[in-house]
Regions:
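Short alpha-helical scaffold segments that flank and stabilize functional sites
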Residues: 18, 30, 37-38
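Peptidoglycan-targeting cell-wall enzymes and recognition modules
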Residues: 1-10, 36-100
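Helix-loop segments that flank and shape redox-cofactor active sites
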Residues: 15-25
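Alpha-helical scaffolds flanking conserved acidic
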Residues: 24-33
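An amphipathic alpha-helix signature
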Residues: 8-15, 28
Length: 100
């Protein structure tokens, strides 16, 4: 398992790059707790043949839906997501599940 202290530091750093609204103590705790529930910070692929990825077990269809129907209309937030994830914004505008 990954050190919870290190995960907290990573989550706090990432949330702060998203903007003040996302860097609150409650927001950080929600993200941290979600990872604990979903994978215990042990797995980055869904067990079995499931499609979910990451410690937070995000399914590609959910990632695409969030990008296409939420972030698409919040360009500033999309840019913050790209910056926080160290991924070019153009990838946040690609809506094919295979990419995610």
């Amino acid at each position: 398992m990954v050190s919870i202290g290190q995960m907290r530091s990573l989550v706090e750093s990432t949330c702060s790059k998203m903007g003040d609204k996302y860097a609150s103590k409650d927001a950080v705790e929600l993200v941290l707790a979600t990872g604990i529930v979903e994978s215990r910070y042990e797995y980055i692929r869904q067990m079995g043949d499931g499609p979910a990825r990451s410690f937070w077990q995000v399914e590609p269809a959910s990632a695409v839906d969030n990008c296409q129907h939420y972030l698409k209309y919040r360009s500033s937030l999309m840019k913050n997501c790209a910056r926080a994830s160290l991924v070019d914004t153009k990838y946040w505008q690609m809506y094919e599940e295979e990419i995610w």
